[in-house]
Every structure is written in C-alpha cells, then in structure tokens.
Amino acid sequence: MWRILSAIALALIVVGCSTLPEELPLGPPGQALAPQPGGPLAAAETALQARLGPEGGPEVSGFHLLDANEAALRWRLALIDSAQHSLDLQYYAWWGDESGVLLMSRVVAAADRGVRVRLIVDDLTTNTLLEIAQERLSDSGLAIVAAHPNIAVRLFNPWRQRSMVGKLFESIEHLDRVNQRMHNKLLIADNRAVILGGRNIGNEYFGLSPEFGFRDLDTLGLGPVARQASAVFDRFWNSEQVVPAGRLGIVATPADLRQAFVGIDAALEAAPRLERFEVAPQDWRDALGDLVQGMHAGSSRVLSDVPGEDDEEEVVHVMPALIRDLLEQAERDVTITNAYIVPDAAAIAWLRDQTGRGVRYRILTNSLASHDVPAVNAHYKAWRDDFLSAGVELYETKPHAAVQPLVVDTPPVVAGFTGLHSKAMVIDGARVFIGSMNLDPRSWRLNSEMGVVVESPGLAAELLANIERDMLPENAWQVVLDEDGDVLWVSGDEVLHRQPARHFWQRVEDVFLMLLPKEIY
C-alpha cells in the first residue's frame, strides 16, 4: 500500500514512454525568501539570541545534534509544521513509505496554509522505485504534488528517456551524465532553521524499517546557518542541472491533488509503525522553546559542491579540497564516523603524513556484517592493513550493536540489523563537520555533496562522546594487526580472524563484487 501512496504523496515515478530533448528548458530564477517577522521559528531565533547574549553575534547560530532516528523525524515534522513563510527541501532520496508519506502530507499542509514550498529531488530516485515495484498508476505523484499552487518541484539531472527501457539505453549512451547525482540532504524552514546531515527521507533513516535501520546523524541549526544553507539551495535551484517538473511533461491539476490525498490521513493513522507520531500538524512552540535552551552556540560554514552552470553538465567538486584543508588544520586529534570508505594509495600516504606529524586519527566505518552496500566493502577491505600501518585506529560497526535500541529503533519497530550511514568528524575537540559526504570515489568525483563546519566545543564534545560510544566493544570491533601482520577483529574477549559477516552469502557476494570497478559505486 505504501508504494502506491508514495506515488500520491511523493515524487517517485513518471509514467509514459516519451523521449525528451537533450537540452531541457530551465525554470525561472528564484531565491530564498528573507526571514520574515512572526511565527514560531522567528520567536525561537529571537529567544536564542537573547539566551546567548554576549556569546552570540551576527555569525553565531544554535546547533542541536540529531543523533536518534526518532528525534530526526520528529524535528523535521516540527520545522515543517512551524514554517509560516517558506520551506526549501533538497534530497537525494525521498521514499514513499510511511515516513515519506507522513512528511509529504505535512509539506502539503504547509502549502495549504500559504507557505511557499520549493523541492529539489534527484531524478535517479524519483524514477525508479515504483517501476521496480511494478505499480501501475494513472498519474505521476510528482505531477500531483507540483500541481499545488504553492509548491514548485525541480529535478536534478533528469532522465531524457522516461521509460525503463529508454533509461537503460540512456545509461549506456550517456553514462558520464547519468552517473552525476545530487547527494545533498537539506530542509530549511522560514530561512531561520535548517536540518542537514546524512539522512535521506525513508523508513530506514528514522528507525521505522523492520529489515534494517541506519545509524545516522544530522544537525538542526537555528540562525545565520539557515541563510548559509539557503545560498546553497538557491545555487542548485538556479543551476543548469535542475529542471522544473512541468518542463518534463509531468503535469496534473489541483483537482488531481485533492483527489489524491483523499484517505491519506486515515491510512497514516492506521499505520502501526507511526504510533508515536501525530498525523495532523502540531503546535511546536513549547518544544522549540525547550530546544533553544539547550542548543550549542557556534559559528558555521555551509560547504557544497557546485552544480554545473553555463551549459556545463558536470558538478564542480570543491568538497574534497575543502575537507582536506579542514583536516590539515588539525593539531591533536581527528575522530571520523563515515559509512562508506574506499581510499587509494595517495589517501593512505596523506594519512601517514598526518599521523607522522603527531595527529591521532580514529575512524569508525561499516563492517561487512553491517553493510547495506556490500560493493563498497569489497573495495574497502583490501585497505584495512594500510590504514593500520599508517597509524590509524580503525573500528567497524556491529550489525546488532547494543546502541540500536537507543538511537536506531523507533518503537514499536525493531530493525533486523544496524548499518552505519553517518558522515561526520570532530577535530581537536572544538570543530565539527556533519554532512552528506562519504569517503569514496563516488562522493569525491561523481556526486554533489554538502555539509556544515561548526566551531563549537560544546557540539564537538557531544558528537565525540557519541562516536566514542559507538566504538565501544558492545557496538563495534576494533580492527588491529597481529604480530604477523594479519588483520584481527577484537571486541572485548572476542577475537575474529576473518571479517565478520551476517551470513555465508554475504561472503560470496563480497568476493564477486571485487571484480567490478570501484569507480561505479
């Protein structure tokens, strides 16, 4: 049922077999609305400034770490419900399951009360999910949502071929273009509050999937950081790689929208997985007041790759150099949690230089047992001993980590296993990076990526404590070399001599995927 509702409530499929021209007409330029007086978020920002006092300033924002999956969904609902003027949302993936439909229903409710909504989604995910599910639908969910007079939808790097067969041939003929994806994750409300980090929109990111749950991370920022994020959003909104849904022949009417949402609320109310969430929009003023009192103060920079402009079809990848420069400023220690890591010889040599000048490096990533993308592990595993020889302390997540009930699962759902999805780092106990960027070839050379750097000892201390908790023996294996140079996985008294896996076929898959080039992942 949820795959059907996704077409009603989300941008997840374009029907038909039409072929579009290679050069697509672009939409009119647009920009974020300046922060307006009035509304819960304006009051929250004012309260934050008053609380910070001399500690505040024109460049200082408040930050709240979204560590637990349930809280990550709840605060997205809070910002959407609290918006009075504008919502700008940018996501790589927005699945049509319970969480995706719930969030989109609240976005439509915001538009109903006059909020201007702009949505950018990557066309790779909008066009595949329901086709794989073999759902047959008379109208595109994308068109239905875009039919709202207060909602504008644009697609990043859209398919020119709209049928599955056409997309297959397009992938072969134009692989370089098709392989460029937008991996950004961003929600901005009233240009005052922002959520950014590693989570897409879908049950596995919010503890609502019984198959598996992601250990992920976002931050909620209030203040100038929202305006910084809006500049990134506008850059994509006005780029050559983003096309309005209507220019792709994806059209519907407001009547289609009204008809589509008949029964949505009842279906959400009846969904067992959503028992801890209200379906109707809520008043979050008290929650926002409490939030403000506990936020960490810090100055910030929102970083992003640059979408192609002036007929350029390729993303300009500035993030790798920015991250490298950030790390080279470390004086004492760097602690990293990152889901997907595939280095090369140059990266290992660079790490050896960093540890050689006295900087302690600790890295937490996925094990084969916790991986949701085994192809990444197939190309990462050969580098374990290189990491260790370079002086890196290496940890790998357990699939049944003790921390799962605390931060992964949202009752009543219990995930079958936990996989790491976060992308964050703490530098010298005072500087934090949280974003969408993995440490693999796709993130460095193909996807657009983004993140925020925050100068905040308080936020850094909280994030560091959480990563160190995830490195404890009940949550991860420490990967070490024995006296013969062989790799071991150590967890308390447990010592494993081959990489842990959930089952035999995972090991078979791991061997097979080594044969495929790592660059395609």
Explain the meaning of each model-derived region.
Residues M1-S6:
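Bacterial N-terminal signal peptides that target proteins for export
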Residues C17-K185, A189-Y521:
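Charged, low-complexity intrinsically disordered terminal segments
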